[in-house]
């Protein structure tokens, strides 16, 4: 019984977190353009593809929207450039693992 309560608590936390984060992802300009329907929907950027020029354009994964994760690359001459790719953050990976494990046990 305790395992069921823990899994239910995790699922409620994940759902509330994902819904609040989805709201945070929309910037004011994006929200206005969605409301006014000014621009057609742009194609999203798939997982592991570069998102340096469009950091809010990543596609959705199984449960969560992919996040644009950036890193600084230092060339041999010392020049630093920022490179970004769409990926699953570690806390989303953990949540997907818990949900997948819960499905195997209870579903």
Swiss-Prot record:
Keywords: Disulfide bond, Knottin, Secreted, Signal, Toxin. The keyword Disulfide bond applies. Expressed by the venom gland. It is found in: Secreted. Residues 1-20 form the signal peptide. InterPro entries: Spider_toxin_CSTX_knottin, Spider_toxin_CSTX_Knottin_CS. Disulfide bonds join 44-59, 51-68, 58-86, 70-84. Its main location: secreted. Pfam families: Toxin_35. GO terms for molecular function: toxin activity. Residues 21-41 form a propeptide. GO terms for cellular component: extracellular region. Belongs to the neurotoxin 19 (CSTX) family. 04 (U1-Lctx) subfamily. The presence of a 'disulfide through disulfide knot' structurally defines this protein as a knottin. This is U1-lycotoxin-Ls1x.
């Amino acid at each position: 019984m305790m395992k069921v309560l823990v899994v239910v608590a995790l699922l409620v936390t994940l759902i509330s977190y994902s819904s609040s984060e989805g709201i945070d992802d929309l910037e004011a300009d994006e929200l206005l353009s969605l409301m006014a329907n000014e621009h057609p929907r742009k194609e999203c950027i798939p997982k592991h593809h570069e998102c340096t020029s469009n950091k809010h354009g990543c596609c959705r994964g199984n449960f969560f929207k992919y996040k644009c994760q950036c890193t600084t690359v230092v060339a041999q001459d010392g020049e630093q450039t920022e490179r970004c790719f769409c990926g699953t953050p570690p806390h989303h990976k953990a949540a997907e693992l818990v949900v997948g494990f819960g499905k195997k046990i209870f579903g």
